[in-house]
Amino acid sequence: MTLGSETKTDVEVPIINGKHEIPQEENDSGHSSINTPDSSEPDKQVDKFVKITIQPSCGDAFELHLSDNELVQELYQTLLDREATCHRTCFSLYLNGTAVDNYSEVRAIPGFVDGCTLNVVDEPYTIRDARLHLRQVRELLKFGLTEDQHEPPCTNDAQSYLTTINLQPEEKKEPKPSDILPPDHALPGCKERSLAHLLVPQPKELIALKDIAFSPYNPPPGPRKLRGDVLYIDITTVENRIYHVTCCTRGFYVNNSQDGRFDPTVSNSNKTVYQSVIELLQNVSPGFKKVYPQILKRRQEKTLVERLPTSYPVSSWVGNPLKTDGYMSDSLRAIELTEPFRVGFEDHMPGLLRDWNEELQTTFEMTRKSISERVIRDRSYYKIHADYVNAAARGVQSILDGNILAINPGEDKKTHMYIWNNIFFSLGFDVRDHYKELGGDAAAFAATSTDLQGVRAFATLDDPKLNTLGMAIFDYRGYRVTAQSIIPGILEREQEQSVVYGSIDFGKTVVSDEKYHELLEDAAHKLKMLPHTVISEKDGVKEELKLYTSYEAKGIIGNDGRKYVLDLLRSMPPDVHYLDDAEVSEAAKTLGYPRKFPHKLSALRRELIDAFCESRLVTFIQLTAKKIRDLITESKEKNDETLIKQAAEAETELSLLFMAISEDKEFEAKNKVVQDAIKEACAVVHSIYEDRYVMKFNPDCFSSNVKHAPTENLERQRRVVVDAADFLLTQKIPELVQNLKDCVVQPIDGDNLADIMHINGINIRYLGEIGKRLENSVSFARPLVLSDIVARSAKHVIRKINVQITADQLSASTSHILNCLFSVVLDPSPIAANVAKKANKKNGKKRVTSAWSSLTTSALWNSIREDSASYYGYPIEADSLEKFTELHDIQKTALFRRICKVMGVQLVARDYQLDNSTAKKTSIFVEDDIINFFPIIKHHEPFTADAKKMFIRGQQAMSIGASREAYECIGESLNLMTLVYGVMHPDMPQCLRALARLSHVLGETGDALNNQHKAAVMSERLIGLDAGNTIIEYINLAHFAFGALLIPGSLRPLYRARYLMNLVFGEKHPVMAQIDANIGLILFTVQEFDTALKYLQSADAITKTIGEPRKLKTGLISNLIARTHAARGDFRAALVAEKETFAIYSELYGPNHPRVNESSEYLRTLTQQAVTFQKKMLKLDNSTNITELFQAQPPTVTSLFDTLNIINGILIIGVPGLSSLGKQQNGTTEESKTTDVAAQLDNETLD
């Protein structure tokens, strides 16, 4: 993260006015600062902003504004970001002649005051400094090159399409038709779904240097080292001249070495010693001197959001084909990526390995009492966790490439374990039959996911007293690899000696520890785990022990003295619908539950448990309150003083009960009436106890491996778990299905669908249940859900095949599998036969043919059908993928994309013509289409709770129309996120989008466009170029660009969004109708009526097809269609469309609504115009211009803006005086804005 606000530079600045400002984007809203201290926070140290001067060793001095809590190290990053100083890396900062510490806060530096001057002093080079310098040179020169698609599949460099769109106002008045009219692939009804348009157009390459490499003469011999030589490098310029360069302590100079002759002394022709390689090249290479300024200009044109690396690895499922003449040599890359012992930070920490566990635990335990302490703690923990995930991703790829030796190489490959870079890796197989009774390999695979869910649950606790391991899961090339940090001392002793809490023999023997009880009590309470007693038997002696978690959880005290808890796979209660011998509700039985499942580790999600407990609590409160209300009513009717007194006492005690419940405290009722009310309510809601409300879950109540104590009421405990599962089946799933049918939620792809299901507490295994309920529906969600079932079932089938494939067969096998899916393969693969034949010949013996080689279309489809039935409970009747996609209107390209993404396959971006009937008989895919595999990463994602709370508060303010308060809260949330995460994070686009909408409502068009542009770029780079969220960001960006009257700038994101929607889903989606309505309205505004009509008619047809024909948006679209017909002179069609508008408005609002009256008036106008037009047509002669015969009444710009706002879910309620709000400068400005402006940003409430 960089810092500061500085004139003429491209560095990050503090959050001001709720925005993360970047220089040269001067769209200040004028709103007051939102960074006010929270009085509720104890001991908060208020940050101060100071202005300092920095005097670089080259170039002019410059001023910098920064917060005094920044680290000095961030000043270094500021200098590396500046154009004038980015090429110098070996320096120190001095204040008053004293070097300052890199890792201290600036406020802690003696003499650091407002107005002071820091001097940059060049330091002598070491080999570490030299290597870091060369890396910086390489990073700078990469800005002139196209994105290299063929570097490792998991990188931190992601592309952005929006960099190709100009959103700046231009001087020319009229845009060209080519700037406005759509490309062919964005037209309604377009059948072309080529992936080639998905890639970002690349600018012309700026090549300043051919290669820079370490010389084979390294390291410097002793005599030269004593004279200051550090490193030797060879540089090949664009003029094809090779310069042998010596890096000495003073800098870089050209030496006298030649091919085959070593002479590191200073060259006779160029005796200058340069501080940087860049300065040296500018003096020896004219080509470099010419191109380098252009590279810097291109770099400066990119904002921080566009060019900074992402925190976590990102991948794309498409890329450019490998061209031998386009793959450039890079000696530094060759060294970094071909040496398996390199861990990625040797140049920063030479000779050291990071202790990930110590770093994670130390930062996790940092104090968090005040908000400033929490920011520091969250920022440190997030940064280290991101480094850990990046390191683990690199390790996983090296392991499966065979570059890392297992710690148990003599055992079966599936049991191999690895330690690399102080990270422990294990494969997702059932080693030593640990999960034999639970499902074998399937259970072992699922256990890692449920374990990660447990880690996430413990990490969300406010003050966890126990430590969990750093953990990440990777699905790569068919394997599941789990990466974990290493507990100190765990490898030095047997597991039996390490575990002090839990069981290591599947529940037969359980150990417990009072210290762990104290630490687990609070965690178990917050996670709604019920303390329970089990029986442990050892050496014939039985003992009753109390557990706060499942017996599977293990407590280990590390050599560092910390108390760790791991194996948290049973932190949530089991899902009884997938346990063969479990009792389920009657409703579940009618739906065919319990069902046989590949494993017995199915668990309910925490979101469901929270929703279920909240629902039961509401029911409990309602029942007890009703009992007391009935008593009060009875006492009043009978006028019995005794009853009145009892009712008053009961009402008082009930209030105390409710207060205790709200504060999460225990309460013992003494009043007999209240006691009876509580008992009755507890019986209805199935409380764990008869006489008090407790809704907690025993995670072991359905486990047969552990013996329960006789005192445990298993019947009640199991009934609560059954009720929770029934709540999922009878309330949450029907609620989601109805929301999908009503278009309340509008997922675009499988990732969006999974997120929505998880938010509602629904596991992915219930996809089949949702699919059944949507099967006969016209909802847009039906093809989405069913295609996701097929994609996930295909993933399960292909995963089993991939683990049997050697590295040399990956391209052939993957292309063959895709051909089996999307074309017709009747015979085994000839490629496979050749591969097997060569392998058999090489080994001199017969080998078993690979599973993929005999695969055919029918065999693969039958396997997918079997998996769909066994895993998702959804029987696929169609006997081929072709019939299945036709039956359910599934777009093949969307299904193809989803399968590639869940498999982690990267393919060449070209037109595969999956819907071409002639291509089905041939091989659509070839080996060269497969570029690479990339890992699918799952991990616990640290977050800042303070930012989330502020964002929720802002959303609440937004929902009641308090725009000013909402803007401040969400701006403060973005401020906190920036302090913790840096410039980019997946949570930030949501904040920026909300700020953009609020700015739009408040009339700040520039701010709205600026914030939304950042949101869209972040979404592209962090989530994906074709992700569902990215499409939504494009629509919002187009909206605000239109508000700024940037017509081409508003249409190009919409055309891109339409192409992506056609690729990701297809046309029959409410978001596609929204896109077409936007395009049609904007084209109508610029009088491109014929093209506008195509889009408006498409929007109207889609809206009616997906089952929402009678809504406000439909009426608005019909009105626009009528006006477009009228503008074209087709009054008969205009009348038909407007009559439909009138009918919709009448049904929605009744006869006297302004919209109904307006539509009625427009019908009369159209009728009059049609009559007038017909009369003039009768008098027509050859000299008459037909366009002069009618005068269409165009809508006002204001009405068009209002229509666009409603289509995109923004309702602005204006009041008199709104237009003058921006001009008010008195003390009541803020109050008047809050009072006069109400913004409702919920899309569906408009309908």
Curated annotation (Swiss-Prot):
Name the residue ranges with Polar residues bias: 30-39
- Region spans: Disordered: 1-43, 1222-1247
Which named protein is this?
Clustered mitochondria protein homolog
Q: Which organism is it from?
A: Caenorhabditis elegans
- Which InterPro entries has this protein been placed in? CLU-central, CLU_dom, CLU_N, CLU_prot, GSKIP_dom, GSKIP_dom_sf, TPR-like_helical_dom_sf
GO cellular component terms listed in the entry, alphabetical order: cytoplasm
Question: Under the GO molecular function aspect, what terms does this record hold?
Answer: mRNA binding
> Keywords, A to Z?
Cytoplasm
Tell me the organism's taxonomic lineage.
Answer: Eukaryota, Metazoa, Ecdysozoa, Nematoda, Chromadorea
- TM ranges are none
Quote the subcellular location field of this record: Cytoplasm
Q: What does this protein do?
A: mRNA-binding protein involved in proper cytoplasmic distribution of mitochondria.
Task: Name the CDD domains on file.
Answer: CLU-central (cd15466)
